[in-house]
Curated annotation (Swiss-Prot):
It is found in: Cytoplasm. GO terms for biological process: arginine biosynthetic process via ornithine; L-arginine biosynthetic process. This is Argininosuccinate lyase. GO terms for cellular component: cytosol. PROSITE patterns: FUMARATE_LYASES. Its EC number is 4.3.2.1. NCBIfam families: argH (TIGR00838). The gene is argH. Keywords: Amino-acid biosynthesis, Arginine biosynthesis, Cytoplasm, Lyase. HAMAP family: Arg_succ_lyase.
Length: 459
C-alpha cells in the first residue's frame, strides 16, 4: 500500500516491519486531540489566506464529522497508515477528496504529535487535580470523625508515641497537597503550543502560531522550533509528579494493609475493596490496596524509561521519541484509577476505635511523657531519659506497664515523681498535651482541619 510520504521510496516495507514501526495501536488514544489540533490549524490557514475559504470549510466539515465519530468510538484505524495523524488524514481524504491533503500545509507530524500530547496531558492533569481534591475531602471527612480517636504512632514500625488518628490521616492530606501543587504548577509548561514549529525549523508559509495557540487555549507558544518538537520535559515532569503521588498512595496502602490484618485490626475495609480466596473461605484480602502498592512500581518504571530514551538524543525529533506515549497513557490510567479507588476505600473503611485506643495502653509509648515530666522539673533530658529507660526495663522484667508501677517505685527512681505522674501517663493526656504547632494535640488537630477545609473551599 502506497504511503502518504512514499514519493521518495522505490520499494515498500514488509508487513512485519510496518507493524513494528506503527504507533496506531496506542496513539489512537490521541484521536480527539489530533482532530482538535487540526481544526485549529486549518482555521488559522484560512484566516491567514494560505487556503481558500471553500477548502477550509470542506476540511473543517470533514474533521467535525470525524470528531463526532471518534467520540462515539466508530473510527476504524489501520496499521497501514502507521499513526493517528496519517489515519485521520486518510479518513479525511476518503471523505472529502484530495482537498483533504491540504490540511497538512505548513505543518509536520513532529509539531502535530507534540501538540496532541500537550492537549492530552492538559486535560488529564486537570482530571487528576480534581481527583486529588476528592481524596483530600475523603481524608478530611474521616479525620473530622476521629480527632479524639487515639492510636499508637510508629517509628521503625514499633510503637513510639500515642497520636490522634485524625492527625495521622491529615499527614496524607498534606502530602497530597504537595502533589496538587506540583501537578498544578506543571500546567504552566504543559499549556504551551508547539504547533507551527514544523519538522524542526519552522515553515515558509505565513502562519500565525499565536492564533492556533489561542484557538487551542494555550497560554503561550514555544519560542524555539527545535525545542518545540524535541521537548518531552513536560511528559517527564508529569511522570515524576505521578511517581511521587503514587509513592504517597503506596505508603498509605501499606498502612491500610497492615491495619486491616488480624495482627492490627485497627480498620476493616469495605467488602467492595477486598476479595476472597479460592481455597480459604475465611479470607478477606485487601487486594485494591495491594494493587495500588504494586502499580506504583510501573509508574516509576515509565519515568526511568523515558529519561533513558531522551538522555542521548540529538536535536530535534528522533523515532525513539515514539516510546514516550505508552508509558504516559498507562501512567494516566494508573493514577486516575488509584485515586478513585483510594477515595472509595477511605470513605467506606470502618475504624475500630476501641482496638486502636486499647493498643496505646499495652506498650511503652508513654515513656516519653515520663522523661518530659522530669525534664520539666529541671532534670537534664539525657539524665531523665536514662531514668525512664531503667523503669521500662524494670517493667519488662516484671511483665507490667508503666501505669501499673506503684508510686514508691517511681520515687525510688527519682524523688521528683509525684502522684500526678499517673495522669501524665494516660495516652489521651499524652496526646492532648502536644499542642505545639503541627502537633497531635486535639486543639492543633482541629486547627489543622479548619485550615484544610478552608484550602479545599478555595477555588
Amino acid at each position: 500500500m502506497k504511503k502518504l510520504w512514499g514519493g521518495r521510496f522505490t520499494k515498500t516495507a514488509e508487513e512485519w516491519v510496518d507493524e513494528f514501526g506503527a504507533s496506531i495501536p496506542f496513539d489512537q488514544e490521541l484521536v480527539e486531540e489530533d482532530i482538535e489540533g487540526s481544526l485549529a490549524h486549518v482555521t488559522m490557514l484560512g484566516e491567514c489566506g494560505i487556503l481558500p475559504e471553500g477548502d477550509v470549510e470542506q476540511i473543517k466539515g470533514g474533521l467535525i464529522r470525524l470528531l463526532e465519530k471518534a467520540k462515539q468510538g466508530e473510527l476504524k484505524f489501520s496499521i497501514a497508515y502507521e499513526d493517528i495523524h496519517l489515519n485521520i488524514e486518510k479518513m479525511l481524504i476518503d471523505d472529502i477528496g484530495p482537498v483533504g491533503g491540504k490540511l497538512h500545509t505548513g505543518r509536520s507530524r513532529n509539531d502535530q504529535v507534540a501538540t496532541d500530547m500537550h492537549l492530552y496531558l492538559r486535560k488529564r492533569v486537570e482530571e487528576i487535580l480534581g481527583l486529588i481534591r476528592g481524596m483530600q475531602r475523603a481524608l478530611v471527612a474521616q479525620a473530622e470523625k476521629h480527632v479524639e480517636t487515639i492510636m499508637p504512632g510508629y517509628t521503625h514500625l514499633q510503637r513510639a508515641q500515642p497520636i490522634s488518628f485524625a492527625h495521622h490521616l491529615l499527614a496524607y492530606f498534606w502530602m497530597l497537597e504537595r502533589d496538587y501543587e506540583r501537578f498544578s504548577e506543571s500546567q504552566k509548561r504543559i499549556n504551551r503550543s508547539p504547533l507551527g514549529a514544523g519538522a524542526l525549523a519552522g515553515t515558509t508559509f505565513p502562519i500565525d502560531r499565536h492564533r492556533t495557540a489561542e484557538l487551542l487555549g494555550f497560554a503561550d507558544i514555544y519560542e524555539n522550533s527545535l525545542d518545540a518538537v524535541s521537548d518531552r520535559d513536560f511528559i517527564i515532569e508529569f511522570l515524576s509528579n505521578s511517581s511521587m503521588l503514587m509513592m504517597h498512595l503506596s505508603r498509605l496502602a501499606e498502612e491500610l494493609i497492615l491495619w486491616s490484618s488480624q495482627e492490627f485490626q485497627f480498620i476493616e475495609l469495605d467488602d467492595a475493596f477486598a476479595t476472597g480466596s479460592s481455597i480459604m473461605p475465611q479470607k478477606k484480602n485487601p487486594d485494591m490496596a495491594e494493587l495500588i502498592r504494586g502499580k506504583t512500581g510501573r509508574v516509576y518504571g515509565h519515568l526511568m524509561a523515558l529519561l533513558t530514551v531522551m538522555k542521548g538524543l540529538p536535536l530535534a525529533y528522533n523515532k525513539d521519541m515514539q516510546e514516550d506515549k505508552e508509558g504516559m497513557f498507562d501512567t494516566v490510567k494508573t493514577v486516575i484509577g488509584s485515586l478513585k479507588i483510594f477515595t472509595g476505600m477511605i470513605e467506606t473503611m470502618n475504624v475500630r476505635t476501641d482496638v486502636m485506643e486499647r493498643a496505646t495502653k499495652q506498650d511503652f509509648s508513654n515513656a516519653t511523657e515520663l522523661a518530659d515530666y522530669l525534664a520539666a522539673k529541671g532534670v537534664p533530658f539525657r539524665e531523665a531519659h536514662e531514668i525512664v529507660g531503667k523503669l521500662v526495663l524494670h517493667c519488662i522484667e516484671q511483665g507490667v506497664f508503666l501505669a501499673d508501677l506503684p508510686l514508691d517505685v517511681y520515687k525510688e527512681a527519682s524523688p521528683l515523681f509525684e502522684e500526678d505522674i499517673y495522669d501524665a501517663l494516660h495516652p489521651r493526656t499524652a496526646v492532648n498535651r502536644r499542642n505545639s504547632a503541627g502537633g497531635t494535640g486535639f486543639a492543633e488537630v482541629r486547627a489543622a482541619l479548619a485550615k484544610a477545609k478552608q484550602l479545599l473551599s478555595t477555588p
